[in-house]
Amino acid sequence: MDLKLLNDQGQAATFSAPDTIFGRDFNEALVHQIVVAYQANARSGNRAQKDRAEVKHSTKKPWRQKGTGRARAGMTSSPLWRGGGRAFPNSPEENFSQKVNKKMYRAGIRSILSQLAREDRIAVVDTFSLESPKTKLAAEKLKALGLDSVLIITDTVDENVYLATRNLPHVAVVEPRYADPLSLIHYKKVLITKPAIAQLEEMLG
């Protein structure tokens, strides 16, 4: 698979990328599965409701068991009563995680990268570095490359690059092992350094 190789001025040449990573068929069902699993595994428990033991209530029986003609009632915390506890309350300990085995996950990442390559959403650079941790420098460099919304995948995240890009709203910098399926799909472009491609090939090939 041929990808665009950009220099610092944004001028393009051709880079021959491995077909094992960038030349696979698109498997929509698999990609959907790993994206949903990734989102589910990122969820944190923040829902809480009270059951009948946790709501504030009196243990006094509202009325006697027999003789009133009304339905029997034991206490006001019953889920049947207004203000009572929930029968099956949501809990912050609820587990939303979904398991995807490594073989499927790697195949899904290869499928995403291949589709991005076909859509011309991947570009390659030799390296990506900055002289100082200035956001202005990072913005100017990305503008010269013709990139605004971009996921930068580099073999090692340079401290200057990290500090300079962290305040840019549509830019993220990650190492190959942290390139998740949601980020790959989310950004308009993916910029990969040559050493990072070698790492991806080793991880996914």
From Swiss-Prot:
One of the primary rRNA binding proteins, this protein initially binds near the 5'-end of the 23S rRNA. It is important during the early stages of 50S assembly. It makes multiple contacts with different domains of the 23S rRNA in the assembled 50S subunit and ribosome. Forms part of the polypeptide exit tunnel. It comes from the Bacteria. Part of the 50S ribosomal subunit. SUPFAM superfamilies: Ribosomal protein L4. Belongs to the universal ribosomal protein uL4 family. HAMAP family: Ribosomal_uL4_B. One of its GO terms (cellular component) is ribonucleoprotein complex. Keywords: Ribonucleoprotein, Ribosomal protein, RNA-binding, rRNA-binding. It comes from Bordetella avium (strain 197N). This is Large ribosomal subunit protein uL4. One of its GO terms (biological process) is translation. GO terms for molecular function: rRNA binding; structural constituent of ribosome. Residues 48-57 have a biased composition (Basic and acidic residues).
